[in-house]
């Protein structure tokens, strides 16, 4: 009974939809019939045996705020479609349906949709989400659609995990974590850097795909910034807290500087060296270098010992000139380690005949020689004993007549060293002191004196022509040389009895002066800072530095101050009775020598002339260059400009040639030439290791804007004339040198040059954007001899009260060397410490003529040439002299000269025009085995030049 009732109930429920469908269809038909509208047929053709097929099924949906959503279904063939939500049938009144015919198949298509509200979803409390599905009927049966879930969309406000700020070293890994807030549907994450979206597809170094995290594999300085995690879904967007990422650079030490000089002149002191934390400099809070920036060590300097006089000697025997004298020496003790020389006279002389001895209407006691050695006293005594006063008077009278006639017949200066008095108005500083025996190289073997010299001031003395000529003919300087050793103490031409440098001003002259010419050359002028420059019509018209001088048979030296360029005219290069106005110029305009291929100009273009002048012996031209010749990576050539303006190669520095000779020193090239013209040095790098030496310097000046300050960093060839052009430009712009220039080795490896400003004080100065680092292409630096190369930086003060500026200028070649210029200055001119452009000038005088232009006295030079020009069986000839003076190449050039030794000495004069290192020449002679005494051990204060005058007057 129960079973039958249950079956009946299930049967009733099974037929309930069909009954409802029937009554619904009947009511609908009646309604349409009552309205008179068209009634669709109850039986629509359908494919036999086909169940309803869903063309459109309901999709999952989200309710946003309070807006309802619509669920749709479409099926064919379908007589009716109903929605079932959460297992219950949706009421018929909530359905909206449409019917149509499928034109292709002729089947009936029915579409139904319902609305689901937020309230319906919230009121449902089931084990799963709110869901709905469609059920479609046909005469063959039913079909069900997929279940579509309906959820209320939301996005919570707070992130489950915000990204955290990081500080990482450069090239380190950065990982920023982000867990977005809970939401339906799940939020999508996007990363922002400084409010700009990050596209990981365009930057392979960044990955944002790993579980919403941001990963930067190798941190760069540009990766510093503020990072934000952005979460969004269909409801809202949420922003996380910003995370600051700082990529820092730890500082690194630069190389140590050289040790400084000892800070005391006497006793115990210290030396120091320093380094800077600039390799690299710390950035963005990076750690400063560990360790000390300055190191100090102790040092000891020898204390100076002042000299003291010994007791006076006995008075000498009365000489034929009615003079006797006594001497004392500064040897108790002698000055050492820079101590002061004894004050006072080293000798005293007086007339020993009560003024009765008369010479040429003047008492001889008015001629007061300043020094006489003990051996000279003994020799004077010998002369008095063996010669006799009567014979001396006769000899003097004969010599007076002979010398007077000789000098009147010659219009040029004599070639003897004593003739320099004609230029100095009677000032002489020659001195012989006979204290040692065995020096037959310089003096008469019978006399056997030593030669010592010093720098002293001598007043004008009255030397008569007869005595002068007697000294020329009888002086022991004309005896053959056997040994010599000389040491220079402090000044030009101190050793070997040659007077100090001085400039003699007078009227221009076209020829040399005869000995009898009475010109006003009695004043020795001080050093002149301005070169004497004379405009010549024959000089080129381009922009250039130039100087000129008049030279005769005695020769001389022409120097371009502060350029490193000089010209040496040897004694005898110009024939007697002739004199020439010789000029020298440096081209400062656009070089006329155009480089071919990899060839570069290494020196200035130097012109010397006149071009039609002929010389009897080669002259020496010194040209500065900027090549690093310490290693053999250059092929250097000497070139000359022809009259047609073209350049032709004279020789390669390493080649053998008999037409000219080139000696390459670290900073200059000394060339021996026979003809005047325009010359220059070019270089062709053999390898990428070839190095040009650049001089780097920084200048500064105020801008038109009172708050701005301009820095100009120059990189020019390391030649004095190139830097002098920079100085000239800066003087016109009002620039001031802020740091002493430094040397930078620039390789020929095609890598560019970088100039950057570092360590600018924050909150006081700022640099204009995008100018802190500037890069110069390799080609501009490698060929920078055309115009001075510089980089300009503009700094701005925050306030006008800022007057001090400190920063560092880093000049470095990529994959090469670098230099640091430390700027510490005041922008106020009244407080700024001036840095001189040149530590010392090249030469006091642009033109020096006669013996004063040479380091080696002419008489000594003659004896050296006479000795070494003679072939020697043991090989001790001019070739050995060349070898000992580091002249080992192209000796065939010297072999073609009439006096090889003279040309070697000319080259020595050109190389040592600055230091005057006569000791090196003396050492060379000693090594050859021709010297036995060392004159350089006799210190400068032990010698007085007046003794040389006295000995010459007495024929000693």
Swiss-Prot record:
Keywords: Apoptosis, Cell membrane, Developmental protein, Disulfide bond, Glycoprotein, Immunoglobulin domain, Membrane, Receptor, Repeat, Signal, Transmembrane, Transmembrane helix
Record topology, Extracellular segments: 31-382
Record bears the keyword ATP-binding: no
Summary of the tissues where the protein is detected: Detected in multipolar cells in the brain subventricular zone (at protein level). Detected in embryonic brain neocortex, especially in the subventricular zone. Detected in multipolar cells in the brain subventricular zone. Detected in brain neocortex from young pups, especially in the somatosensory cortex. Expressed in developing limb and mammary gland.
Intrachain disulfide bonds: 73-134, 85-132, 178-229, 262-299, 266-303, 277-289, 318-352, 322-357, 330-342
Pfam families linked to this entry: Death (PF00531), I-set (PF07679), TSP_1 (PF00090), UPA (PF17217), ZU5 (PF00791)
Domain of life: Eukaryota
Residues that carry a glycan: 115, 226, 351, 379
Gene Ontology CC terms, in alphabetical order: cell surface; plasma membrane
Position of the signal peptide: 1-30
One Gene Ontology molecular-function label: netrin receptor activity
Domain Ig-like as annotated: residue spans: 52-149
Protein name: Netrin receptor UNC5D
């Amino acid at each position: 009974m129960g079973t039958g009732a249950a079956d009946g109930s299930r049967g009733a429920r099974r037929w309930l939809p069909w009954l409802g469908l029937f009554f619904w269809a009947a009511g609908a038909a009646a309604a349409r019939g009552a309205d008179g509208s068209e009634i669709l047929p109850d039986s629509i053709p359908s494919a036999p045996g086909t169940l309803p097929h869903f063309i459109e099924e309901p999709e999952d949906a989200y309710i946003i705020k309070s807006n309802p959503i619509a669920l749709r279904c479409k099926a064919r063939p379908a007589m009716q479609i109903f929605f079932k939500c959460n297992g219950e049938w949706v009421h018929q009144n909530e359905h909206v349906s449409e019917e149509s015919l499928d034109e292709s198949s002729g089947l009936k298509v029915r579409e139904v949709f319902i609305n689901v509200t937020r309230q319906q979803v919230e009121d449902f409390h089931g084990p799963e989400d709110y869901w709905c599905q469609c059920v479609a009927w046909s005469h063959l049966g039913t079909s069900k659609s997929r279940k579509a879930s309906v959820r209320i969309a939301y996005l919570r406000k707070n992130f489950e995990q915000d990204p955290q700020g990081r500080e990482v070293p450069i090239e380190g890994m950065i990982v920023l974590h982000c867990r977005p807030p809970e939401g339906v549907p799940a939020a999508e994450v996007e990363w922002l850097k400084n409010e700009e979206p990050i596209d990981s597809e365009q930057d392979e170094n960044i990955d944002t795909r790993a579980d919403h995290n941001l990963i930067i594999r190798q941190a760069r300085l540009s990766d510093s910034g503020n990072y934000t995690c952005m979460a969004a879904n269909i409801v809202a967007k949420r922003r996380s807290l910003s995370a600051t990422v700082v990529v820092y650079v730890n500082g690194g030490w630069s190389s140590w500087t050289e040790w400084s000089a000892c800070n005391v002149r006497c006793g115990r002191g210290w030396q120091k060296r320093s380094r800077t934390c600039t390799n690299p400099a710390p950035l963005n809070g990076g750690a400063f270098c560990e360790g000390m920036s300055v190191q100090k060590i102790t040092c000891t300097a020898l204390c100076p010992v002042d000299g003291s006089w010994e007791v006076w000697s006995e008075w000498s025997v009365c000489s034929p000139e009615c003079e006797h004298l006594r001497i004392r020496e500064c040897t108790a003790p002698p000055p050492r380690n820079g101590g002061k020389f004894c004050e006072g006279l080293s000798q005293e002389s007086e007339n020993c005949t009560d003024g009765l001895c008369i010479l040429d209407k003047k008492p001889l006691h008015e001629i007061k020689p300043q020094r006489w050695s003990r051996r000279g006293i003994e020799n004077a005594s010998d002369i008095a004993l063996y010669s006799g006063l009567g014979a001396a008077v006769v000899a003097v009278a004969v010599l007076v007549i002979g010398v007077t006639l000789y000098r009147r017949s010659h219009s040029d200066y004599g070639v003897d060293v004593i003739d320099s008095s004609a230029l100095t108005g009677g000032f002489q500083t020659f001195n012989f002191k006979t204290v040692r025996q065995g020096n037959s190289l310089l003096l008469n073997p019978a006399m056997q004196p030593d030669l010592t010299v010093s720098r002293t001031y001598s007043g004008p003395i009255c030397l008569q022509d007869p005595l002068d000529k007697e000294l020329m003919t009888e002086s022991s300087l004309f005896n053959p040389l056997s040994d010599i050793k000389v040491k220079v103490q402090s000044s030009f031409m101190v050793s070997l009895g040659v007077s100090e440098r001085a400039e003699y001003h007078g009227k221009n002259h076209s020829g040399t002066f005869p000995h009898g010419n009475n010109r006003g050359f009695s004043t020795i002028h001080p050093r002149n800072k301005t070169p004497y420059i004379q405009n010549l019509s024959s000089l080129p018209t381009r922009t250039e530095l130039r100087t000129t001088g008049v030279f005769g048979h005695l020769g001389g030296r022409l120097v371009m101050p502060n350029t490193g360029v000089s010209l040496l005219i040897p004694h005898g290069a110009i024939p007697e009775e002739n004199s020439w106005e010789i000029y020298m110029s440096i081209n400062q305009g656009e070089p006329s020598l155009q480089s071919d291929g990899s060839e570069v100009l290494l020196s200035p273009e130097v012109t010397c002339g006149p071009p039609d002048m002929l010389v009897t012996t080669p002259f020496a031209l010194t040209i500065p260059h900027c090549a690093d010749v310490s290693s053999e990576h250059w092929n250097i050539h000497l070139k000359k400009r022809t009259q047609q303006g073209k350049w032709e190669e004279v020789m390669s520095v390493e080649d053998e040639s008999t037409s000219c000779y080139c000696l390459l020193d670290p900073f200059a090239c000394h060339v021996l030439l026979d003809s005047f013209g325009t010359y220059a040095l070019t270089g062709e790098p053999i390898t990428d290791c070839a190095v040009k030496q650049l001089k780097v310097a920084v200048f500064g000046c105020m801008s038109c804007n009172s708050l701005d300050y301009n820095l100009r960093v120059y990189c020019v060839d390391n030649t004095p004339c190139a830097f002098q052009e920079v100085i000239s430009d800066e003087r016109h712009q009002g620039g001031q040198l802020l740091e002493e220039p430094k040397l930078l080795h620039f390789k020929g490896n095609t890598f560019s040059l970088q100039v950057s400003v570092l360590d600018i004080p924050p909150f006081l100065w700022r640099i204009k954007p995008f100018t802190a680092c500037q890069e110069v292409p390799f080609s501009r630096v490698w060929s920078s001899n055309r115009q001075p190369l510089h980089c300009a930086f503009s700094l701005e003060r925050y306030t006008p009260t800022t007057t001090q500026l400190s920063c560092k200028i880093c000049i470095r070649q990529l994959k090469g060397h670098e230099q640091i210029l430390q700027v510490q200055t005041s922008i106020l001119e009244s407080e700024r410490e001036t840095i001189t452009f040149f530590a010392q000038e090249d030469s006091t005088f642009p033109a020096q003529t006669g013996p004063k232009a040479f380091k080696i006295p002419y008489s000594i030079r003659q004896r050296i040439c006479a000795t070494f020009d003679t072939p020697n069986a043991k090989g001790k000839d001019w070739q050995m002299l060349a070898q000992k003076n580091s002249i080992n190449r192209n000796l065939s050039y010297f072999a073609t000269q009439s006096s090889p030794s003279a040309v070697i000495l000319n080259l020595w004069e050109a190389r040592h025009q600055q230091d005057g290192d006569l000791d090196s020449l003396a050492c060379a002679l000693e090594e050859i085995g021709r010297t036995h005494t060392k004159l350089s051990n006799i210190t400068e204060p032990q010698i007085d030049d007046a003794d040389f005058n006295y000995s010459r007057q007495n024929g000693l």
